Amino acid sequence: MGELSEYRQGCGHPEQLTFETSMEFRRINNLPPYVFSIINGLKIEARRAGADVIDLGFGNPDIPSPQIAVDKLCEAAQNPKNHRYSLSRGLPKLREAAAALYERKWGVTLDPELEITNTIGSKEGFSHLMWVLLDRGDAAIVPSPSYPIHIYGPLFAGADLRQVPMRHLADPRVQDFETDFFDSLTTAYDVGWPRPKVLIISFPHNPTGAVVDLVFMQKVVDFCRERDMIVVHDFAYADMGYDGYEPPSILQAEGAKECAVELYSMTKSFSMAGWRSAFLVGNAEVVQALVKLKSYLDYGMFQPVQIAATVTMNEAPDFPKEVCAIYKGRRDALIDGLAKIGWDIPKPKGSMFVWAPIPEPYKDMDSVEFCSHIVRECDVALSPGLGFGPGGEGFIRFALIENEQRIAQGIRNLKRGLTKLG
């Protein structure tokens, strides 16, 4: 059937195998090339050769989860009753805790029975949500650049994807991207047939770190209500706002529940990446449609994880502030350090990433070539902008997943290898 050629670990994706086969897997074979695997392969090769590669590519949180979550998980796992199948939509107390969190932080009232469902991480929730919202031949609008699953999810559902290059959104030096964003959005909706059914957004934005206010969210809601569209807001960085900025929930906008759903995850806010605890909240019809689909696909998360997540949201509500402060320190260390070696980048006000244009002396390289050069010459792994869609070409992404001392070492490595800077 095939020959196993090489093992590679994906960047933010499950472990991947490069495997040659004569069999036809249409849904898989039609996916775009996964460019992160190139950098991962070089990183693995360098580490096997003994290099100390500083990984600022994969957005995998390194901050320990709350101790209360760990303790409650261990306690709940001792009870055999918790070893059985659970509810695919999550325990009632878990959904009630999520509702309380939204009320407390954003003043949004949610019905735990109808407007909240637990998902096994936001990627699982988003991917299956696309199955609910889109059929073959439907269209979805996705800004470019975007988080890769926002691109792949509609394709898995068989939909047509309209990646809208957002030139101002992509450039961190442009602070006001709103006019360009809505002009591009309107054009994407008006051109072609069928009319798009779904808009996918995420703010604070991955990969660019761009942020928006509630006025922007209201315009998104109004845009979608006028066109009978559903807007899906991936709120992965809900608790990561810097320099006085606080990210708004799209559900704070007037009329949002008529057309909007939002994904909230404990991955970044509570540094619980491997726990896979997230929620879809908002429009009851959409939420309940996902509940029905999930009832055929899974039996929910391991119940001790649900119990631990419930207790954590209720009893450690300030933990996200501690996490945010750590990422802010790392952001400042990275950007201040880069400025000292001649690479000036504006400080993003949100997310756990820093998005940067390729420095002028290296503009002859595309983003994959530049990141490959960085791994080979600097022992630093970054993410090429092309991996986030065509609108990301010419840029690279730093993930703030090393401590400040390691970031400082990374800066020294970059100074050594990027000889054209200065």
Segments (PLM) and residue ranges:
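Glycine-rich loop-to-alpha-helix module at the N-terminal edge of alpha/beta enzyme cores
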Residues: 56, 79-85, 97-104
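PLP-dependent class I/II
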Residues: 4-24, 29-34, 39-54, 59-76, ...
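Conserved AMP-binding/adenylate-forming core of the ANL superfamily
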Residues: 94-98, 121
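Short beta-strand to alpha-helix junction loop
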Residues: 89-90
